[in-house]
């Protein structure tokens, strides 16, 4: 309970110390929940700074770190999608030394996002519950599913199209497997 109080009430300017305390003293079964809560507090602060028009990108990176440590793909996904959109804009704007056509910019930003997702899934042995078959109701009907990673699935399917257009069908099929069969 003491660690929970630290996460909930400690000054966020000391977030690194809070994180170090969690890494050192949190029980394994409590760590993810506490790291996620710390990430949520940091994300709230980050979103508040965005609303004020003064977003601190270091805050976003800190949020991502906490969510990664917690193994929360659902939470880190929104941050990565935001980064992907910024990367795509930077490429299109010509702020890089790369091909800045809209298609190339989007494909490159998508690839960066997919690399992050795949590395994350392997690093934390993430299991996507939405890839499991749905449990039928008592009457035998299958419930309508809401996919918590729907925004990510949309980008995965876009990436599948990019890969298929390049003739990389074997790789495209591996990415299709990262989306639920019932997802459309």
List each language-model region with its residue ranges.
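Extended alpha-helical solenoid/arm regions of large eukaryotic scaffolding proteins
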Residues: 1-184
């Amino acid at each position: 309970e003491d660690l929970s109080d630290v996460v909930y009430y400690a000054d966020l300017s000391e977030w690194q110390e809070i994180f170090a305390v969690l890494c050192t003293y949190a029980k394994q079964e409590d760590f993810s929940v506490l790291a996620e809560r710390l990430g949520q507090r940091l994300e709230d602060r980050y979103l508040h700074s965005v609303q004020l028009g003064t977003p601190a990108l270091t805050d976003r990176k800190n949020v991502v770190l906490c969510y990664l440590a917690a193994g929360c793909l659902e939470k880190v996904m929104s941050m990565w999608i935001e980064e992907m959109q910024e990367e795509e804009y930077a490429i299109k704007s010509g702020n890089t030394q790369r091909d800045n056509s809209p298609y190339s910019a989007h494909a490159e930003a998508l690839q960066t996002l997919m690399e992050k997702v795949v590395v994350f899934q392997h690093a934390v042995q993430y299991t996507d519950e939405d890839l499991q078959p749905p449990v039928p109701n008592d009457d035998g009907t299958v419930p309508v599913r809401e996919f918590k990673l729907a925004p990510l699935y949309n980008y995965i399917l876009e990436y599948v199209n990019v890969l298929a257009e390049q003739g990389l069908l074997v790789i495209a099929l591996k990415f299709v497997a990262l989306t639920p069969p019932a997802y459309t």
